[in-house]
Curated annotation (Swiss-Prot):
Taxonomic placement: Bacteria, Pseudomonadati, Pseudomonadota, Gammaproteobacteria, Enterobacterales
A GO MF label: urease activity
Coiled-coil portions: none
Xref: PANTHER family: UREASE (PTHR33569:SF1)
Gene, per the UniProt record: ureB
Subcellular location: Cytoplasm
Keyword Zinc: no
CDD domains hit by this protein: Urease_beta
Family: Belongs to the urease beta subunit family.
Top-rank lineage group of the source organism: Bacteria
Keywords: Cytoplasm, Hydrolase
UniProt entry tagged with the keyword Cytoplasm: yes
Protein name: Urease subunit beta
């Protein structure tokens, strides 16, 4: 084995990211005067206010891109992006502090 080499069992086929999770597609426009970059696990609902989109629809969603990647929105640019629902406990903490807890109430 070569240092840094990754060996993959080809018989297993491709790995599908976020299989079975709820996804949605939205249009995002950067109305600011600076580029805005959004990382793979950032809660889209809480991104920079210069990014304009139907914000309420994005509660509990992140970009559907591989971990560690990001999407950059240049000033004046409009892009279509795919989102994927957060999984696990569905609790959001940090970011801009707009949620700070469970996404759904206990009654659901």
């Amino acid at each position: 084995m070569i240092p840094g080499e990754i060996r993959v069992n080809q018989a297993l086929g491709d790995i599908e990211l976020n299989a079975g999770r709820e996804t949605k597609i939205i249009q995002v426009a950067n109305h600011g005067d600076r580029p805005v970059q959004v990382g793979s696990h950032y809660h889209v609902y809480e991104v920079n206010e210069a990014l304009k989109f139907e914000r309420e629809e994005t509660l509990g969603f992140r970009l559907n891109i591989p971990a560690g990647m990001a999407v950059r929105f240049e000033p004046g640019q409009c892009r279509t992006v795919e989102l994927v629902a957060f999984d696990g406990k569905r609790e959001i903490y940090g970011f801009h502090g707009k949620v700070m807890g469970k996404l759904e109430s206990e009654n659901k």
